[in-house]
Amino acid sequence: MRLILLGPPGAGKGTQAAFLTQHYGIPQISTGNMLRAAVKAGTPLGLEAKKVMDAGGLVSDDLIIGLVRDRLTQPDCANGYLFDGFPRTIPQADALKSAGIALDYVVEIEVPESDIIERMSGRRVHPASGRSYHVRFNPPKAEGVDDVTGEPLVQRDDDREETVRHRLNVYQNQTRPLVDYYSSWAQSDAAAAPKYRKISGVGSVDEIKSRLSQALQS
């Protein structure tokens, strides 16, 4: 099973990716982790990437694709792989296609923007323990304080509504076009085209898991 999960921040991709990697026995390919591993291992591409990053530059798509190709030759990719946070842009998707990297499915997890804002801006954490709550879906026993210590809960900067809205705007402008890219390719009936599936990301984790399983069998 070789696939890409698409969807806005807060759509639950991380939770579903964990289920899929376990279910199919495939690794989650994250370009961030891959870059760090290549730099640490001192591979030729890793050293090249380190040079760029040390100079404060952005690693080129060509270099990323080279790292992806290297990563996919490793034994744990024999049964497939799941791309996490990649590709993010049309040029990256084009580069992936040109490199002949096979895909079986591209799955879009769709969640209305208002739901995402509520999900993310309602999160609260207890910094010392990492315990997390949600003002609506998983509230503490007493408002604004940790159940165990009674210490105040905080809202992380990442979860503030203005930050969430900014991240959603970046997604709409940069990554959302991939939805059209992959759905058009899937409809073209080209030999290498992946199947494109869209599922609703609204509901319980198990409900979404079930929708995802059905989508990957159709």
From Swiss-Prot:
Principal EC category: transferase
Pfam families: ADK, ADK_lid
Region ranges (LID): 122-159
SUPFAM superfamilies, A to Z: P-loop containing nucleoside triphosphate hydrolases (SSF52540)
Top-rank taxon: Bacteria
One biological process term in Gene Ontology: AMP salvage
GO CC annotations on file: cytoplasm
EC numbers on record: 2.7.4.3
Regions crossing the membrane: none
Keyword Ribosomal protein: no
One MF term in the entry's GO annotations: ATP binding
Binding positions (ATP): 10-15, 123, 132-133, 203
Catalytic activity: AMP + ATP = 2 ADP
Protein family: Belongs to the adenylate kinase family.
PANTHER family noted in UniProt: NUCLEOTIDE KINASE
Function summary: Catalyzes the reversible transfer of the terminal phosphate group between ATP and AMP. Plays an important role in cellular energy homeostasis and in adenine nucleotide metabolism.
Comment, domains: Consists of three domains, a large central CORE domain and two small peripheral domains, NMPbind and LID, which undergo movements during catalysis. The LID domain closes over the site of phosphoryl transfer upon ATP binding. Assembling and dissambling the active center during each catalytic cycle provides an effective means to prevent ATP hydrolysis.
Identification of the protein by name: Adenylate kinase
Organism: Bordetella parapertussis (strain 12822 / ATCC BAA-587 / NCTC 13253)
Protein's gene: adk
